[in-house]
Amino acid sequence: MNGTFFNHTLMEQVAYNNTTSQDLGSLMGCCNGSQTVITNDGGSLILIPDERSLFITRVVQIAVLCVLSLTVLFGIFFLGCNLLIKSESMINFLVKDRRPSKDVGAVILGLY
């Protein structure tokens, strides 16, 4: 929930309660950050954020998150493929070692 939604909701509540405009002004001034604080030297304490640096920071965060996500996905994929290949080769190794028993031929001939 952002601050503007909160402030507009409070404004509407105050307006419906038929309070004076002075109460409305003090409510808006204390909550939404629009009230300026002036120091002894005449400067203001409210700093306007540099939107460009915020945008660049967000883009870098998104790029790093995408790279890390792709790294994890490819790691899981290649690990799964490697395990699949190893299990397949182990199955083939076991199949080659198995030889039919001599008794199998006798049973087949005995049935006829």
Curated annotation (Swiss-Prot):
Membrane-crossing residue ranges in chain numbering: 59-79
Keyword Membrane attributed: yes
Keywords: Membrane, Transmembrane, Transmembrane helix
Disulfide bond entries: none
Cellular component annotations (GO), alphabetically ordered: membrane
Topology relative to the membrane: Single-pass membrane protein
Compartmental location: Membrane
Top-level taxon of origin: Eukaryota
The keyword Membrane appears for this protein: yes
Major subcellular site: membrane
Signal peptide bounds: none
Family: Belongs to the reprimo family.
Protein name as catalogued: Reprimo-like protein
Taxonomic source organism: Xenopus laevis
